[in-house]
From Swiss-Prot:
InterPro entries: KsgA/Erm, rRNA_Ade_diMease-like_C, rRNA_Ade_methylase_Trfase_N, rRNA_adenine_dimethylase, SAM-dependent_MTases_sf. S-adenosyl-L-methionine binds at N23, L25, G50, E75, D98, N121. It holds the Pfam family RrnaAD. It catalyses: adenosine(1518)/adenosine(1519) in 16S rRNA + 4 S-adenosyl-L-methionine = N(6)-dimethyladenosine(1518)/N(6)-dimethyladenosine(1519) in 16S rRNA + 4 S-adenosyl-L-homocysteine + 4 H(+). Its EC number is 2.1.1.182. It is an enzyme of class 2 (transferase). The keyword Methyltransferase applies. GO terms for cellular component: cytosol. Belongs to the class I-like SAM-binding methyltransferase superfamily. rRNA adenine N(6)-methyltransferase family. RsmA subfamily. Keywords: Cytoplasm, Methyltransferase, RNA-binding, rRNA processing, S-adenosyl-L-methionine, Transferase. It comes from Paraburkholderia xenovorans (strain LB400). This is Ribosomal RNA small subunit methyltransferase A. Specifically dimethylates two adjacent adenosines (A1518 and A1519) in the loop of a conserved hairpin near the 3'-end of 16S rRNA in the 30S particle. May play a critical role in biogenesis of 30S subunits. GO terms for molecular function: 16S rRNA (adenine(1518)-N(6)/adenine(1519)-N(6))-dimethyltransferase activity; RNA binding.
Amino acid sequence: MSTSRQQQGRHQGHIARKRFGQNFLVDMGVIDSIVDVIRPQRGERMVEIGPGLGALTEPLIERLATPEAPLHAVELDRDLIGRLKTKFGDLLELHAGDALAFDFGSLAAPGDKASLRIVGNLPYNISSPLLFHLTAFAHCVIDQHFMLQNEVVERMVAEPGTKAFSRLSVMLQYRYVIDKQLDVPPEAFNPPPKVDSAIVRMIPYELHELPPVDERVLGELVTAAFSQRRKMLRNTLAAYRDSVDFEGLGFDLQRRAEDVPVAEYVRVAQIVAASKA
């Protein structure tokens, strides 16, 4: 790596590691705006994914953490873990490891009531798999606020009939109310990413609000539908025609996957699951 690139990627003596997808947030105005969107309250159960050098961690701790109710954080980079422990002490409980394998449910309060808030500047190279991993814990989550690549956020909030509407749109919109909150330019980071970023808010639907469906079946159906985006559903969903009376259901196969609302995918998945029972 050249000296100039090292300097650009160095912040507080730490060189950003590409394999961890590290881009450190450095713009204090942007940091303050993000914290205002999150609105942390004293004593809340909150976990930050990828705290990095603590740019967002510090104001979160100031607003909510106590030694009895610390901010939790999941961090993979062991060099950063030591720095964070030294800086924040017992106000931050660190969990060393990969967020893609972490059991976020272990941080929730006992019982059925949602109690956990999740925040983070997510590594862009694993953002989609991580969002899917988090759906397994939606039942115990109050809300999620993430910094993501703007293109990903646009897909998360996309409406049917638009090019941005995708498998990610369907699977996340089934489980969450999703709103884009804030645009973040590349120059807010060190090193600056090559893409624009945005803050997104995700609020899980309560279980009684969700139409009952086998999410594995829904995922398989949606994956098949979007497997060849330019083809009609009569081709991509051909394997389902024996188990689903699409015509009787009023489901038009002369459409592309991006034209079908979430509720229609859910209804077909319910029928597919029932046929396998």
